[in-house]
UniProtKB/Swiss-Prot annotation:
InterPro entries linked to this entry: DUF2509
Pfam family, one: DUF2509
Protein's name in the database: Uncharacterized protein YgdB
Entry keyword set: Signal
Signal peptide: 1-26
Signal as UniProt keyword: yes
Amino acid sequence: MNREKGVSSLALVLMLLVLGSLLLQGMSQQDRSFASRVSMESQSLRRQAIVQSALAWGKMHCWQTQPAVQCSQYAETDAQVCLRLLADNEALLIAGYEGVSLWRTGEVIDGNIVFSPRGWSDFCPLKERALCQLP
């Protein structure tokens, strides 16, 4: 009878060990998934900050009224900032970096480009989407 109690106790300990191991594996997998999501979110925020900074730089940059499409690279990044002059003295400032783009509308007034005080847009403000692409 004592032997049966020892075997059942051993079985119970082994079962607890297996369940604990499964629980730890699940938590480890969940932790890796969470770390991956945090890393992706961090990279996304970094890209967004670079594009916003590039757009602000482009707003202050001295653009000419010709040619109709002008581009410049923002600082030490690969962010590209382009000004597209449209019909009816309208202008569109485009900033892009690693798949993230922002736009800001403006207009040409007395030979100067004046950007909208409303800020940037994270979607194309034009009906013709091809005009919103970086060249």
